[in-house]
Regions:
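Conserved acidic catalytic loop of the alpha/beta-hydrolase fold
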Residues: 73-89
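Glycine-rich His-Gly loop
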Residues: 27-31, 95, 213
């Protein structure tokens, strides 16, 4: 495994892990994650693909409280890493990382042979965080990361209440969330700052696989459906029995879906 390093236009150091050889898969993790979020997925891919996994700047070690963060910054970071890679590049994103991937592709569609977007929480008809994001930010500022986590999972992600309480009752889980909380708040704010609507993607004529979990929250599936009728070359893949975190609950299933979509595009 190698590490790729480059510098963003504002001087921020960007890193990515580089495994395997073959056609290039470029993976962008979701909220509160990092390059290791894909650890369960890549063993099924690295024998046939070069797999590059970036760590998004707001979740990098020592990132602190992000200043003036936006999806434009995220997209530029994706493009900076993509510029280091041999083409063709098949771009994969999960959750807010899928939004960053989509925004990057919109800015430079020629850089990517295809897209694989797993439940991007795009504000298609409504904002993602809205009032709940303000409540989560307030709880975090008050020194209560557990309550901020509860609000995020219950009111923004919209997980079932009983599952949320189980997760919040786990001190290790709360500690992990607390370590990523500033980035997660900035992430949701950046999503909402995009504004409601997706008409701009009608011109993005790149083969796109939109992926949903059968058990995922309804709002994520609705947002995905809105993108499906907007993107010119979109098709939807449903992961049976899965929710919003198949990279953890069924990594081989997700890897198979990535492989199938990539081979369809890359040949």
């Amino acid at each position: 495994m190698a590490e790729l390093v480059t510098t963003a236009t504002d001087g921020t150091h960007l890193t990515a892990l580089d495994n395997g050889s073959g056609p290039t898969l470029f993976l962008v993790h979701g909220g509160s994650g990092d390059a290791s979020s894909w650890d369960g997925v890549i063993p099924s891919l690295v024998n046939d693909f070069r797999v590059v996994r970036m760590t998004r700047r707001i979740y990098a070690p020592g990132a602190g409280t992000p200043q003036a963060h936006s999806m434009a910054v995220e997209a530029a970071d994706v493009l900076a890493i993509a510029g280091l890679l041999d083409r063709p590049v098949f771009l994969v994103g999960h959750s807010s990382g899928a939004v960053a991937a989509l925004e990057a592709a919109l800015r430079a569609p020629g850089m990517f042979a295809g897209l694989f977007l797993y439940e991007p929480p795009m504000p298609t008809r409504s904002l993602v965080g809205a009032e709940a994001a303000r409540h989560a930010r307030k709880a975090l500022a008050a020194g209560d990361p557990g309550e901020a986590m509860r609000i995020h999972l219950r009111d923004i992600v919209q997980l079932p209440a009983e599952l949320v309480e189980t997760l919040v009752a786990d001190p290790k889980g709360v500690a992990v969330f607390a370590s990523k909380a500033a980035g997660q708040v900035a992430d949701v704010d950046a999503l909402d700052a995009l504004g409601v609507g997706v008409d701009r993607f009608r011109r993005l004529d790149v083969p796109t696989t939109l992926v949903e979990g059968e058990m995922s929250p309804a709002h994520l599936r609705e947002r995905l459906a809105d993108l499906a009728v907007t993107l010119p070359q979109a098709q939807v893949r449903t992961l049976t029995g899965q929710g919003h975190a198949a990279q953890l609950t069924a990594p081989e299933v997700l890897a198979d879906a990535i492989r199938e979509a990539a081979e369809r595009v890359l040949g």
